[in-house]
């Protein structure tokens, strides 16, 4: 990962690693692959809570990714203390996630803790809302849209070394 290799590393985080962070991970991996940058980037996702470890993402998330021709085979995992040292960037989907990340970060954390939506989304769209209890896939499609914009902008800024 980031600190063990020359690759830059990104960890996408939401509450349970079932809906938002797997979509963000899949979108980021797809963008990296399309740009031919697989040798430069390592991307994963995790959940703050250990409610769903080992499970596949929500079926609605997988359906939306499939509609956009993006494969995803990951399984949910919980955020680990070492993630804060091994990843360069850890992205929260909302302010609650960010607050939890800040509380959980061990002393000496080297990762940048950021809100994914701050990269290219309008101020009123920057929070990527949890769709877990929503009916249907419309909110998952919106998450895909938000993640696509934010990941594209982050990758562009990171490659230009514009991330502080």
Curated annotation (Swiss-Prot):
Which GO terms fall under molecular function for this chain's record? acid phosphatase activity; non-membrane spanning protein tyrosine phosphatase activity; protein tyrosine phosphatase activity
The UniProt entry, under InterPro entries, shows: LMW_PTPase, Ptyr_pPase, Ptyr_pPase_sf, Tyr_Pase_low_mol_wt_mml, Tyr_phospatase_low_mol_wt
GO CC annotation, single: cytoplasm
Q: Where in the cell is it found?
A: Cytoplasm
Q: In which tissues is it expressed?
A: Cone cells and primary pigment cells in developing pupal retina.
Q: Which family does it belong to?
A: Belongs to the low molecular weight phosphotyrosine protein phosphatase family.
Protein's name in the database: Low molecular weight phosphotyrosine protein phosphatase 2
Which organism is the protein's source? Answer: Drosophila melanogaster
Lineage, highest ranks first: Eukaryota, Metazoa, Ecdysozoa, Arthropoda, Hexapoda
């Amino acid at each position: 990962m980031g600190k063990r290799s020359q690759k830059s590393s990104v960890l996408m985080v939401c509450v349970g690693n079932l809906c938002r962070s797997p979509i963000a991970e899949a979108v980021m991996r797809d963008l990296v692959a399309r740009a031919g940058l697989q040798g430069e980037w390592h991307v994963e996702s995790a959940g703050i809570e250990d409610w769903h470890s080992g499970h596949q993402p929500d079926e609605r998330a997988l359906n939306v990714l499939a509609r956009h021709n993006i494969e995803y085979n990951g399984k949910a995992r919980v955020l680990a203390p070492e993630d804060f040292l091994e990843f360069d960037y850890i992205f929260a989907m909302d302010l609650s996630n960010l607050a939890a990340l800040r509380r959980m970060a061990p002393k000496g954390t080297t990762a940048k803790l950021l809100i994914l939506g701050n990269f290219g989304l309008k101020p009123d769209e920057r929070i990527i809302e949890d769709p877990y209890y929503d009916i249907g896939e419309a909110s998952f499609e919106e998450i895909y849209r938000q993640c696509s914009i934010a990941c594209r902008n982050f990758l562009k800024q990171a490659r230009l070394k514009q991330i502080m």
